[in-house]
């Protein structure tokens, strides 16, 4: 089953945008927001456009089990902060390649130094 979930996560990462569902803890309300997602040679990554102030990001740190969905297709994933500079550079390149031409201003924002620490690896569970 984990292989199927991982395959679906990679498939969803091909989408321009996904929705991420987060909650601070099991008793808290569920929140859903649209975000960008990128596949890299190191894994699948997401990042908070609002930096560390983003609610979904804060909730994902507090409760790293999230749901990533496109329409009716969804996968449960565990997110974990990425600190490796080599991987961060690969994620930057993936954002540029996937979004840079169509959304140059928004992509530039996603590559700001203040946003980079919000890079999270998504691992299907």
Which role fits each region the language model picked out?
Residues 51-125:
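Short, structured beta-strand-loop surface elements
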Residues 6-8, 23-24, 106-109:
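Short, P/G- and charge-enriched loop/turn segments at secondary-structure junctions
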Residues 1-19:
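Extreme N-terminal tail/first-helix region
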Residues 15-50, 58, 66:
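Short beta-strand segments
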